[in-house]
Amino acid sequence: MLSLEQKMDYNKGHIEEKYNLNDKFLKYLEKEDRVMIILDAYSGSKPFWTKYEKGRVVLTNDTNKDYPAKLHFPAEDLVKVLYEKEYEFDVVDLDPFNTPMKCFDNAIKICNRGLIMTFGDKRGIISNKNLAKERYGCRVYDERKIIQHYIRRAKKFGVKLRVWKFVKWKMTWRVYFKVLTPSSL
């Protein structure tokens, strides 16, 4: 199990690259005709998306009440309630320490331009081969197969995902999806 110190530093070696990609992805998705609405379901101690609040709506969430988030709920519960209340977001960012899988089914239903998913579960899955099959339907932990798993899963909800960018760092990786709904095709 990762120590708290390791968890807090997991972004250290790639944080600037991650933030630069977030900037580029937002510019890629953004249209000037309306305000962008962003959900950061796991915002952490330094919520990245809050710097974009001018001219946009940013909803931050983290279970840790000491963190400067607007809400403090388990992300999977929050995303489920947002779906049930028919909220929609232009961008949904799922960046947990582990896997975003618990949020995916509802997150895909509430985002209409971009979905960002970070996976930090590689270390745990390497030591337990059955987890790759249970979580992602593949025999071994293979990022590209996991991406395909989520693309297929999104289709079940009538949503087409197209990979905009996929990046890997040591035991963590992140995928940026352009969301193609019938209204955006």
List the predicted regions and their residue ranges:
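S-adenosyl-L-methionine
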Residues: M1-G55, T60, T63-V91
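A short, conserved alpha-helix within the catalytic core of class I
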Residues: N98-C111
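Conserved beta-strand signature within the Rossmann-like core of class I S-adenosyl-L-methionine
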Residues: R113-I126
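Short, glycine-/aromatic-enriched active-site segment of Class I SAM-dependent methyltransferases
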Residues: I125-G137
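Class I S-adenosyl-L-methionine
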Residues: R144-L185
